[in-house]
Amino acid sequence: MKIKDFTVGQVVYAFSYEDIALLKGLKPKKYTVAKIGRKYLYAARGEEVNIKTVPDNLLIGFKEPDYTDDFLEENIDYGYKAILFPDMEIAKDYYHKRKLVRFLASGVKWESYTLDELKEIQKILGVQV
């Protein structure tokens, strides 16, 4: 996801990265995109916001993270960052992906499967060991 994919005036959805990492559910905060720069996107809290009247100190900056293209992250140095999505559908897909990754990493008892079943899973995933 790139900054140029957003437009000024667009309603976007932010989530605490902590909530998504710990699978606490999707509790969105709605923001309105106020400014778009080369490195940062600035958004104002709320859905029905007149972005021309919001002072700069109330705008929250978001940037493209180096490690993923799935979302934008809040530009802060400490604490839990908020992550920004252009719509709820993309946010739900990302949350579902995190749940599946966690489930497949720790929720499945792989030892209970036979060798043939594990080889079939390996074929489906297309990975070599």
Where are these regions (language model features)?
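Cystatin/cathelin-like cysteine-protease inhibitor module
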Residues: 7-9, 13-15, 43, 113, ...
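Short beta-strand-centered aromatic/proline hotspots
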Residues: 23-38
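Intrinsically disordered, low-complexity, charged/polar segments
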Residues: 46-129
